[in-house]
């Protein structure tokens, strides 16, 4: 049986000897902007829209790497933050959705999901880099979100202009960002924004004991997709609720619901229905990392086995330090490259393991 101690050693070796060096060398261009993908030979994939959420996630990743003792991470994070600020800030205090490879804006849309990760990256930059720009930018960004994107039905709009369906997911990541800020530089505005997401979770997203994904403008269940439940998000909400100290009973209930209905063959699957029926039996890497992180926080005995299973499947690539993001219900993958966006998920789970004393 794999122990957490052995898992910690395996994670440390993979992260510090392979993944971080690979993505710091090949996953960043000459200007410090992060590529969206590396192919399975470890070469950057050119010509894709470079999404703000990915740039922000990678700033967090390399900040966290530095905090864990990988000193090279500081320089990568600093240049990435510089480019994030230079390329992507709008005049109204919000941030654009995407640029091209040269940093030219190709989508000016302010998207709440992107904005949540900008706030999260700024928190990491304040905590690890001590960057003097980070907190003022976070305060300005949150104020712009409240001013320009607040919905009369609660929470914030998906984007400007508003679009449907509304999703719980961006609000979940807003909570994540606000908790990160409250842990290092508390502010009433951060606390208020966290409360917005927490209240929506309990009074709108939670239906019959599980978090639903898609909604109408007034937070009624979306007619087409309002029944969808993602086990990975049950785990993610469980961890965030536990971190917030807001509702430990709900955190436990969501974790148990995921464990009871959301796994097949040891992995968290993509989608289930209200009765636990499988809607999509495929799986993605991010859901496994959420299961690992939440399982660690609850002291689950099966975490080390899940880590081993992830290494034997998702992380079993010819070039170490890459990953297979997705498998279908028949355990086949059709991925052509490793998305940079997954490294954030891996880092949140693996940093939890590396800091644990179990």
Q: Could you tell me what each predicted segment is?
A:
Residues 1-358:
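Glycan-recognition and catalytic cores of secretory/periplasmic carbohydrate-active enzymes
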């Amino acid at each position: 049986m794999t122990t957490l101690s052995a898992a910690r050693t395996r994670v440390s070796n993979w992260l510090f000897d392979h993944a971080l060096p690979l993505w710091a060398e090949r996953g960043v261009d000459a200007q410090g902007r992060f590529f969206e993908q590396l192919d399975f030979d470890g070469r950057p994939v050119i010509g894709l829209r470079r999404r703000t959420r990915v740039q922000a996630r990678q700033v967090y990743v390399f900040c966290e790497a530095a905090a864990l003792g990988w000193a090279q991470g500081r320089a990568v994070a600093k240049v990435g933050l510089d480019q994030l600020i230079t390329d992507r800030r709008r005049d109204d205090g919000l941030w654009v959705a995407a640029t091209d490879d040269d940093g030219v804006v190709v989508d000016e849309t302010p998207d709440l999901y992107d904005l949540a990760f900008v706030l999260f990256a700024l928190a990491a930059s304040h905590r690890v880099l001590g960057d003097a720009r980070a907190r003022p930018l976070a305060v300005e960004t949150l104020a712009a979100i409240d001013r320009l994107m607040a919905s009369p039905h609660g929470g914030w709009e998906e984007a400007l202009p508003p679009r449907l369906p509304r999703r719980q997911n961006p609000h979940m990541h807003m909570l994540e960002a606000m908790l990160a800020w409250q842990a290092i530089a508390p502010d009433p505005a951060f606390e208020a924004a966290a409360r917005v997401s927490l209240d929506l979770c309990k009074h709108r997203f939670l239906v019959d004991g599980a978090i639903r994904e898609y909604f109408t403008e007034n937070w009624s269940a979306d007619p087409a997709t309002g029944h969808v439940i993602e086990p990975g998000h049950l785990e993610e909400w469980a961890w965030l609720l536990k971190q917030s100290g807001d509702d430990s009973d709900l955190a436990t209930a969501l974790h148990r619901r995921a464990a009871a209905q959301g796994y097949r063959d040891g992995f968290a699957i993509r989608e289930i229905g209200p009765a636990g029926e499988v809607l999509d039996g495929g799986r993605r890497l991010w859901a496994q990392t959420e299961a690992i992180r939440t399982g660690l926080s609850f002291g689950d005995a099966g975490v080390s086995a899940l880590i081993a299973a992830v290494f034997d499947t998702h992380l079993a690539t010819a070039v170490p330090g890459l990953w297979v993001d997705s498998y279908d219900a028949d355990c086949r993958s059709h991925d052509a490259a490793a998305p940079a966006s997954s490294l954030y998920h891996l880092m949140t789970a693996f940093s939890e393991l590396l800091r644990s004393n179990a």
